[in-house]
Regions:
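Short, contiguous alpha-helical
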Residues: 4, 8-12, 16-19, 28-71, ...
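Acidic/histidine-rich alpha-helical segments that form the ligand environment
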Residues: 75-112, 120-132
Length: 157
């Protein structure tokens, strides 16, 4: 079973991937949508910030956060610097919260029934990790289609 430090490492890696996507988008494409595509990359980034702060930061970590889910999908032209600052804060917050979860707490029920069935904290964090990567993949694909550029290179480790 995954521990808090293992979850923290995974979220750290993939929140860095999300920030790299933001850096790779030019301003003209960040809020652009294509036919048949509902959300821009900018809106997906706002959504991931709100989702992870609400479910991991607030519900698991007890860190105050007032989510405005409607704004996550309706806001346009949020300054890049604001999104970058939100993602940088998220990249600090989420691993800290996850690393602090006690082994017994992973088996407790997540405090909110979001998916229609009670889930343990562990199960719900696994769901959130999949959700993060689903949207990071969408963002990457949008960037490639809109810019004509290929995959981002992996950072040196």
């Amino acid at each position: 079973m995954a521990t808090g430090s293992e979850f923290a490492a995974l979220f750290t890696r993939d929140l860095a991937r999300l920030s790299r996507q933001l850096d790779a988008f030019d301003d003209a494409h960040l809020w652009q949508v294509l036919p048949g595509v509902t959300n821009s990359a900018g809106n997906l980034m706002l959504h991931l910030n709100g989702n992870l702060r609400a479910f991991i930061g607030l519900q698991i970590g007890g860190v105050a956060y007032g989510r405005d889910r409607a704004r996550e999908f309706s806001a346009k032209d949020v300054p890049r610097a604001e999104i970058a600052a939100d993602l940088a804060g998220l990249a600090t917050l989420i691993p800290e919260v996850l690393a602090a979860v006690t082994p017994a707490r992973w088996d407790e029920l997540f405090p909110e029934n979001v998916l229609g069935t009670p889930l343990s904290n562990r199960h719900f964090v696994i769901h959130l990790y999949g959700h993060l990567n689903y949207h990071v993949g969408q963002i990457d694909y949008l960037r490639r289609v809109l810019s004509g550029e290929g995959a981002l290179t992996r950072p040196a480790t």
